[in-house]
Swiss-Prot record:
Location within or outside the cell: Cell projection, Cilium, Flagellum; Cytoplasm, Cytoskeleton, Cilium axoneme; Cytoplasm, Cytoskeleton, Flagellum axoneme
Native source organism of the sequence: Bos taurus (Bovine)
InterPro entries the UniProt entry points to: CEPT76/DRC7_peptidase-like_dom (IPR056290), DRC7/lobo (IPR033551), DRC7_C (IPR056292), MORN_DRC7 (IPR056291), Papain-like_cys_pep_sf (IPR038765)
Coiled coil keyword on record: yes
Protein function: Component of the nexin-dynein regulatory complex (N-DRC) a key regulator of ciliary/flagellar motility which maintains the alignment and integrity of the distal axoneme and regulates microtubule sliding in motile axonemes. Involved in the regulation of flagellar motility. Essential for male fertility, sperm head morphogenesis and sperm flagellum formation.
Keywords: Cell projection, Cilium, Coiled coil, Cytoplasm, Cytoskeleton, Differentiation, Flagellum, Spermatogenesis
Principal location class: other
GO CC list: cytoplasm; cytoskeleton; motile cilium
Protein's UniProt name: Dynein regulatory complex subunit 7
Gene: DRC7
């Protein structure tokens, strides 16, 4: 303490000296500054320069730590179980205190047990009663991984007040869910409650963790979304060599040169691997340069899931902050003091010198785990042979059972209310709808559905360096998009964009890879072939070529490759519709058609449009090693003089494995060439249509990206405008029907009959006066209602005119947001004006009818009908 006081006094003296020096410098510079102010005047250019310099200054606002204390919790509306203890709970607290005293006496070097912290009402509650097993109604929360991920996203982490001690307060899960904040013990309690409700054998653990684990620091961890799944390489089964297979030619390359080349390649790989390992070691050394002075002392809480229930094959840990699962031998977990569930409490009696690697989670072993209560489940109870032999005596068994019954004490029910998560909260997930997680060379951002106008729900940004300054690539996940966009992958280095779509796009688009949205650029489009009539699977486009792959077509077309030549120069804008690119070559390939013989089934045909040639290659028969080929010289049907050109043998060059008589005839060759001419026209037309389709898809994608409309389910009544309007209309109809019923039950003569003496019989003149007063009063009310509607109509009109005048005066300086607000106000104002106008016109039409209807009712009223007969 004396050393601390001396340090404080030295710091105060240094601050006083520094303040005195600052004051002296201020006095010295005060007068020259005043002289300068008098001499220099600030011009407009100097002011603009100063404003520019000031705008470049960035002020960093320190982030406020999340505060979650008792003072921030409203305890006025909490139920009685939160504010007091039952007799059974008080008995349990006494048992826990007795257990704690015995434990402290037997283990004086161990820290005090975490048994009964205070709740939000400052009432001591045993930790096991804070767990409320609950099965949530959402299927996603039935498995441990998705349940832990939901809690990690839904809550915000608050660090422990003292990193070396467990918290003094342990709040209920309902309070934690309400405020969406909590420390590691709050996270673990909520997660354990939901896992036990889902059928898992889960326990809350009070122990010690690493600094990264306690601070939820993932900057040294690799993001799971960046790790690529390991591809299992399937070894190709080598076909057995055929008996009469052709032997490969003899290899005449030097074996010595091959060995030297292999050694050189291995040396290069070893050098690269060594360099990579050195770089990783250097980076790891930089990351671990700052050792934690509190290593092994930081208190942390997590969840233990034991094997057995829900087909869990092996026990594991769950960190509630990150929702990650770890082995029970992981280095992040440095020791365990105790653990508990909703039935019992266990104290770890094993040594944690080797972290948690040597711990045995046999909770039925009283040597390793000291339990608090008797008469509860003891999982994995394993008895030694000596104990088993000692338990053979029937009398001892009966006596032991009686003693256990006398000493057993059941755990009281949980004092926490039923844990409930509303559908809105379950959908929103993250606090305020957004959460950011920083990983090693990556940043993960999450949003709630419908929070962003473009449907963005997740974004993963990967960086090249540890400081996260140079972006490598971005992945963005979308939901509820009308264009079925699911994932957008942007590579910042190559500039390649890849869009992934779910089934349902208007053009059956599945994947779209591109660097620019301009037409006739490098791009790849993949389609859902089952949703297209033409069976198109993939289309690859470059400035000079276009390649299409097909499947399941009736003509067995599988491949089409089009080569384009330079476009003819025109003054108008070049496009596939106005000035298409000239096609130079079209190559088409076909699957095997089993209905045709292989000699007549075309496998590939090439239209050399510029050279006026057509090349055909047929499928190869199974018993042949070569295939038939033909080449046609396509000429014009008439010459320059108009004479018809006759088919000649030199116009068809063919190679046939087994020549046939009918294929040599000129008529057969002429008919084949005429058919190929028509097919060439069809292929050129289909290629031109493909170009137009690309333009249509690009235009559609630009419109979709600009509009980014979101779809809303018909069952989502809060967001679906049509359902909302229909519901409001139904409510309005029911309200009007209710008003009509109330109006029918009203006694319209009651206010006027009350003015007469009670029990007096009406005279004829009194009846006439009552009728007139009632009609006059109703007429006045109709007039007042019309005046009220007219006044509201005029008020809305004047306010709209003022707003329009304000817009005309400030139109130049308005921002796009202000213009959107103005247009929205005008739309709403016009809607209100139109409704008021309709109400006024309707009131004018119905007022006379209502007046006549009331007059008729008065004449038919049984109290006046006899007295008013004379006037009818």
């Amino acid at each position: 303490m004396e050393v601390l006081k001396e340090k404080v006094e030295e710091e105060e003296a240094a601050e006083r000296e520094e303040a005195a020096e600052r004051a002296e410098r201020g006095e010295k510079t005060k007068r020259p500054m005043e002289v300068r102010r008098e001499e220099t005047t600030m011009t407009q250019e100097m002011l603009r320069d100063l404003e520019r310099k000031l705008s470049e200054i960035e002020v960093s606002v320190p982030e406020k730590l999340l505060a979650f204390t008792k003072d921030t919790i409203d305890t006025s509306k909490l139920p009685l179980s939160y504010q007091s203890n039952t007799l059974k709970e008080e008995h349990l607290l006494q048992v826990a205190d007795n257990f704690s005293r015995q434990y402290s006496h037997l283990c004086p070097d161990r820290v005090p047990l975490f048994l009964h912290p205070l709740n939000e009402c400052e009432v001591p509650k045993f930790v096991s009663t804070t767990i409320r097993p609950t099965l949530m109604p959402y299927p996603e929360l039935y498995n441990w991984d998705t349940c832990a991920q939901f809690i990690s996203d839904f809550l915000s982490m608050v660090p422990l007040p003292d990193p070396l001690k467990p918290p003094l307060y342990l709040y209920s899960s309902t309070t934690v869910l309400k405020y969406q904040k909590g420390n590691c013990f709050d996270f673990s309690t909520l997660l354990c409650s939901m896992l036990i409700g889902a059928g898992y054998d889960a326990y809350c653990v009070n122990g010690y963790g690493s600094q990264d684990l306690c601070h939820m620091d993932l900057t040294r961890e690799v993001c799971p979304l960046t790790m690529k799944p390991k591809e299992s390489v399937k070894e190709e089964e080598k076909a057995p060599p055929k008996k009469y297979a052709i032997k490969p030619p003899r290899d005449l390359t030097s074996r010595f040169e091959q060995e030297q080349e292999m050694k050189r390649q291995e040396a290069i790989k070893a050098e690269e691997e060594n360099r990579r390992k050195q770089e990783e070691a250097r980076l790891l050394e930089q990351e671990n340069a700052k050792t934690d002075p509190l290593h092994g002392l930081r208190v942390h809480s997590w969840v233990l899931v034991l094997s057995g229930k829900r087909e869990v094959p092996e026990s594991f840990f769950i960190d509630p902050f990150t929702a990650r699962s770890y082995s029970t031998q992981d280095d992040h977990f440095l020791g365990i003091e105790s653990l508990w569930n909703h039935k019992n409490y266990w104290v770890n009696m094993q040594d944690c010198w080797n972290c948690c690697k040597d711990l045995v989670f046999d909770l039925g072993d009283p040597v390793r785990w000291e339990y608090l209560l008797l008469g509860t489940d003891k999982p994995f109870l394993s008895l030694t042979e000596e104990e088993d032999e000692g338990m053979n005596d029937d009398d001892d068994v009966e006596n032991l059972g009686k003693e256990d019954e006398d000493k057993s004490f059941d755990m009281p029910p949980s004092w926490v209310e039923q844990i409930e998560i509303s559908p809105e909260a379950f959908e929103t997930r993250c606090p305020n709808g957004k959460k950011v997680i920083q990983y090693k060379r990556a940043k993960l951002e999450k949003w709630a559905p419908y929070l962003n106008n473009n449907g963005l729900v997740c974004r993963l940004t990967t960086y090249e360096d540890l400081e996260c300054t140079k972006t490598l690539e971005m992945k963005e996940w979308y939901q509820n998009r009308e264009d079925m966009l699911e994932l957008k992958h942007i590579n910042k280095i190559t500039g390649l964009n890849v869009d992934y779509f779910k089934p349902g796009h208007p053009q059956a688009l599945r994947v779209h890879s591109y660097k620019s949205m301009q037409p006739e650029m490098d791009r790849v489009m993949e389609f859902y072939e089952t949703a297209r009539v033409d069976g198109l699977i993939k289309r690859e486009e470059t400035p000079k070529t276009m390649t299409e792959h097909y499947q399941g077509r009736p003509d067995f077309l599988s491949y089409r490759h089009v080569n384009f030549g330079p476009r003819m120069k025109k003054l108008a804008l070049n496009s596939a519709e106005s000035n298409p690119r000239p096609m130079v070559k079209i190559t088409e390939r076909f699957f095997r058609n089993p209905a045709k013989p292989a000699d007549e089934d075309v496998a590939e045909r090439v239209f050399l449009i510029a050279e006026e040639r057509i090349q055909l290659r047929y499928h190869c028969r199974s018993d042949h090693i070569t295939a038939n080929k033909r080449e046609f010289l396509r000429r014009t049907e008439v010459d320059s003089k108009g004479n018809k050109i006759i088919m000649t043998p030199d116009m068809c060059i063919s190679f046939e494995v087994e020549p046939m008589e009918h294929t040599k005839k000129l008529l057969y060759q002429y008919e084949a060439m005429m058919k190929l001419k028509n097919e060439e026209k069809l292929s050129r037309h289909q290629a031109w249509e493909s170009e137009l389709e690309v333009l249509e898809i690009l235009k559609l994608r630009e419109e979709e990206e600009e509009a980014h409309t979101l779809t809303i389910s018909i069952y989502d009544t809060k967001r679906n405008e049509k359902c909302k309007e229909y519901r409001e209309a139904m409510e309005r109809v029911l309200h009007e029907e209710h008003l009509r019923q109330v109006e029918a039950q009203l006694d319209y003569l009651a206010p006027f009959l009350a003015q007469l003496p009670p029990g007096e019989k009406l005279t004829r003149w009194q009846a006439v006066r009552l009728k007139d007063e009632c009609l006059n009063d109703f007429k006045q009310r109709l007039i007042d209602k019309a005046n009220l509607i007219q006044a509201r109509f005029e008020k809305e009109t004047q306010e709209l005119q003022k707003k329009q005048q304000w817009y005309q005066e400030n139109q130049v300086t308005l921002t796009p947001e202000d213009e959107d607000l103005y247009l929205s106000y005008c739309s709403q104002a016009m809607f209100r004006i139109r409704i008021l106008e309709q109400r006024l016109s309707r009131h004018k039409e119905l007022a006379p009818l209502k007046y006549l209807a009331l007059e008729e009712k008065l004449y038919k009223d049984p109290r006046l009908v006899e007295l008013l007969k004379v006037f009818v």
